[in-house]
Amino acid sequence: MGAAVRKGTAVTTAVRLAPLTHLDVLESEAVHIFREVAGEFEKPVILFSGGKDSIVMLHLARKAFAPAPVPFVLLHVDTGHNFPEVLDYRDRAVARCGLRLHVASVQEYIDNGRLHERPDGTRNPLQTVPLTEAIQSLKFDAVFGGG
């Protein structure tokens, strides 16, 4: 790892650093962006469903601010078509990190007649209205999303 070199009475240690991988560079950029947004915006939010993309986003946010807590809240637009295990994992991850989670429900919009089921059964396109209304009503001024 390092080699001690004697120069007069001082000892210097030379350390060889491994070159950064492409993944290291991407991670560093993501951490920088999280910190920059925290400094420039009043109320950022991370979209968080408990899926793989949002888990990576939360991991990067935690890395950006460790050992302090992540200074953002989380928002999930629940389609109503999620596996119960994913929602359970989502809730456990949020609790483990000590964060607050807001949930906007597509089903609630359908139940109150503001949205209508699609003939093909997919609800992904229906997430737009609950998402934009949650962003506006909760006054988020920056939004992080994965995938």
Features from the language model and the residues they span:
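ATP-dependent adenylation/nucleotidyltransferase module used to activate substrates
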Residues: G2-G147
